[in-house]
Amino acid sequence: MVIRSDLLNIWEQVRAHLPPDFDLERTARERCAFLRKRGVKDVASLLRLALAYGGCGMSLRETCAWAGALKLASLSGPSLMERLCKAAPWLGDIVAGLISQQATLPTKRWAGYRLRAIDATAICQPGADRTTWRLHVGFDLASGQVDQIALTDGRGAENLQRLTYRPGEIVLGDRIYARAHNLQLVKRDGADFIVRTGWNSLRLKHPNGSDFDLFATLRAQAGQEGEVRVRVDDGPGESTALELRLIIWRKTPEQAETEQKRLLKNAKKRGTKVDPRSLEAAKYVMLLTALPADAFPACDVLAIYRFRWQIELAFKRMKSLAGLDELAAKEPALAQAWLYARLIAFLIAEQIAGQVPESSPSAPGKARIKQKPRAKPFALAHDKNGPHCNPRHHSRIAVARHSRRPEAIPSVSM
C-alpha cells in the first residue's frame, strides 16, 4: 500500500493544532466514543485511526493493517467500522473545536463589519444518483477560514437557519438564501445581509404595501446600476415585514448572452422550456440588503458581494485538495465519521497554510488559475526538495498523488 501522506508522520504536530482546551479523553467518554479499550490503545490512537481512514483515504482493512504494524490497535475491519461509527459525534465535536479556535483569532473588518459568506456543497456516497450529504459552511472572508459548519443528509435544505449570526456581521448569500423567513432570522440576530435574488424568489412590494412590478422597474433603469426601496413580507402583519434596498446592476450584452445561453442549454437538457421572464432577468444582477444607503451606496454593496466567490474557492480546495467528494462509505454513521475526519485534516492544513488569494481567478482581466491534477489525499509536506515546497514557506500544503492499487504497508509513525 502506498500512502504518501506526511499526515501519518507528524502526529505530534497534528495534535499540537488541536484546541488546547479540548480534552480528548473526557469528550470521548462523554460521547461514548471510547468507553473500553477493546483493541485500541487509547483515545489518541482512536483519533489516529479515524484520521488514517478518513483523513488519509485508507480502507478499513488497510487502516487495521497500518495500526497493527505500529501496535496502535489490534482490530478487524468490522470492529474498526463499529468503533468509528460510535466515534462520529465525537469527531464532529473536534471539528467544532477547531472552528471555534479559529473564530477567536482577530479578523479584519470592512467599515466596522465582519464579512461572512454562507453556502453549501453536496457530497455523494459511492453509486448515488443524488445528494447524500450536504455540508453547510460559514466562511470568514477576512481570515480566509471556515468559521462554522453544519452537516445534514441530502434532505437538509440550504437556508440561513443552519448557522448562527452575530451583530456586526454582513452575511453574503446566493439567491437560494433569498427567503423572507431566512432574512428575518439574520436581522433578529443583529446581523446584516447581502443576498442575491431572482425574479421569482420573493414576493416584492412597494414600501406602502402595493404591488411591485419588477420588470417595469428593470426596463425603466437608465444607468448600469440603480436601486429602489421594496418591502418583503414573511407573513401577515406589519411586524413581519422587512423594508429592503433592491440593488440592480445591468450586465454587459456579452455577460447577458452567456447567461441566457446557459439557461437555454439547461432547459434543453431537461426537456423543458425557459420562461421568457428568466431570459429577461438574466440581463441583471439583483441584490437585497438592509444596509443603510448613506454608509453603503449601491456601488459598495455590489463590490462587497463580489467577495462571495472566495467560499466557492474554499469548496474547490475541500474537494480537489482534501478529497471531500471522494466519500468511500455508504453506512450513514461511518460516512459521518469519514467526513468529520477529512474535515479535521483539512482544517489543520488550512491553519498551517493560512493563505487567501487577493482576487478572484475569474475576475475580468485576471489570468485563470490552472488547476493541479486531482490528488488523493492532500499532505502536510515537510520535504524541502519536494515540487511544492518553497524554502521560505516550509508549512505549505503539498499535493501527493497516490496509486489506488495497494503495494506494501508503509513503515510510518503517527
Where are these regions (language model features)?
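Short, basic alpha-helical nucleic acid-contact segments in DNA-binding proteins
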Residues: 81-103
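Single, function-defining residue in the core of a domain
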Residues: 1-57, 65, 74-75, 79-87, ...
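Short alpha-helical "recognition helix" segments of helix-turn-helix
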Residues: 62-69
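Short, conserved aromatic-histidine micro-motifs
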Residues: 104-111
